[in-house]
Curated annotation (Swiss-Prot):
<dbReference type="GO" id="GO:0009229">
    <property type="term" value="P:thiamine diphosphate biosynthetic process"/>
</dbReference>
<comment type="pathway">
    <text>Cofactor biosynthesis; thiamine diphosphate biosynthesis.</text>
</comment>
<keyword id="KW-0808">Transferase</keyword>
<keyword id="KW-0784">Thiamine biosynthesis</keyword>
<feature type="binding site">
    <location>
        <begin position="182"/>
        <end position="183"/>
    </location>
    <ligand>
        <name>1-deoxy-D-xylulose 5-phosphate</name>
    </ligand>
</feature>
<feature type="active site" description="Schiff-base intermediate with DXP">
    <location>
        <position position="95"/>
    </location>
</feature>
<dbReference type="InterPro" id="IPR033983">
    <property type="entry name" value="Thiazole_synthase_ThiG"/>
</dbReference>
<protein>
    <recommendedName>
        <fullName>Thiazole synthase</fullName>
        <ecNumber>2.8.1.10</ecNumber>
    </recommendedName>
</protein>
<keyword id="KW-0704">Schiff base</keyword>
<dbReference type="InterPro" id="IPR013785">
    <property type="entry name" value="Aldolase_TIM"/>
</dbReference>
<dbReference type="InterPro" id="IPR008867">
    <property type="entry name" value="ThiG"/>
</dbReference>
<dbReference type="Pfam" id="PF05690">
    <property type="entry name" value="ThiG"/>
</dbReference>
<dbReference type="GO" id="GO:0005737">
    <property type="term" value="C:cytoplasm"/>
</dbReference>
<feature type="binding site">
    <location>
        <begin position="204"/>
        <end position="205"/>
    </location>
    <ligand>
        <name>1-deoxy-D-xylulose 5-phosphate</name>
    </ligand>
</feature>
<comment type="subunit">
    <text>Homotetramer. Forms heterodimers with either ThiH or ThiS.</text>
</comment>
<dbReference type="GO" id="GO:1990107">
    <property type="term" value="F:thiazole synthase activity"/>
</dbReference>
<feature type="binding site">
    <location>
        <position position="156"/>
    </location>
    <ligand>
        <name>1-deoxy-D-xylulose 5-phosphate</name>
    </ligand>
</feature>
Length: 256
């Protein structure tokens, strides 16, 4: 069971809603993934229409929505987007995203921390997307963020856990849940993150652009479950030298 702020989750797989060929395919993939929370970019939603093609089916599905501030380039823009989301969707949960460079979509650490401090003061449950920076993640935690969401690799790159060494430090020192976000391109990447001790992963592109998104969503669900089970079971220590699984007993000499 995963607890973040005032919510508990059975699934440790969170999903995104972008890049799917259709809303129906998106919903089917989310259902197959077992995910209980999906992110939603406020910039993609027409809040003036109750039958918005993206928002309406998501609300009807019962999955918890995590609006994000994608598109914001400054703390002020992110705070405004969060306030808009709270007013329109009736949620105080927000995924904080501030990436000023559209080419790389890397999070701005200074603006992210500034926005996080303001949003926490306004009563938001803040889940910040951030670089795999252990110092920044600790500062965000100290600012009152309910979780931290460090990247594994650039958004949509499918490169996997390129920041593994830093993620290990973040996980080791965190007192709030760590959700690995961005760059996860294969079920094996998700399993690796959970085996390391990450509390959850957020996956969008790898599912949405797969040849069969529904089957890929199922694969990610199974990978996350396997990774968490492996972590809880206790992985064996990695060693440099070979260690025999069947110690010598001298029986060969005894037969001579």
């Amino acid at each position: 069971m995963l607890r973040i702020a005032d919510k508990t989750f059975q699934s440790r797989l969170f999903t995104g809603t972008g890049k799917f060929a259709s809303s129906s395919l998106m919903l089917e993939a989310i259902r197959e993934s077992g995910s209980e929370m999906a992110t939603l970019a406020m910039k993609r939603v027409d809040l003036l229409r109750r039958d918005d093609a993206l928002l309406a089916p998501l609300q009807a599905s019962g999955v918890a929505l995590l609006p994000n501030t994608s598109g914001a380039k400054t703390a002020e823009e992110a705070v405004f987007a969060a306030q808009l989301a709270r007013e329109a969707l009736g949620t105080h949960w927000i995924k904080l995203e501030i990436h000023p460079d559209a080419r790389w979509l890397l999070p701005d650490p200074i603006e992210t921390l500034r926005a996080a401090e303001k949003l926490v003061a306004q009563g938001f449950v803040v889940l910040p997307y951030c670089g795999a920076d252990p110092v920044l993640c600790k500062r965000l935690e100290e600012a009152g963020c309910a979780a931290v969401m460090p990247l594994g690799a650039p958004i949509g790159s499918n490169q996997g856990l390129q920041t593994r060494a830093l993620l290990e430090i973040i996980i080791a020192q965190a007192s709030v849940p760590v959700v690995v976000d961005a760059g996860i391109g294969a079920p094996s990447h998700a399993a690796e993150a959970l085996e390391m001790g990450a509390d959850a992963v957020l996956v969008n592109t790898a599912i949405a652009v797969a040849r069969d998104p529904v089957a890929m969503a199922r694969a990610f669900r199974q990978a996350v479950e396997a990774g968490r089970t492996g972590f809880e079971a206790g992985l064996g220590a990695r060693v440099f030298q070979a260690q025999a699984t069947s110690p010598l007993t001298g029986f060969l000499e005894a037969q001579a």
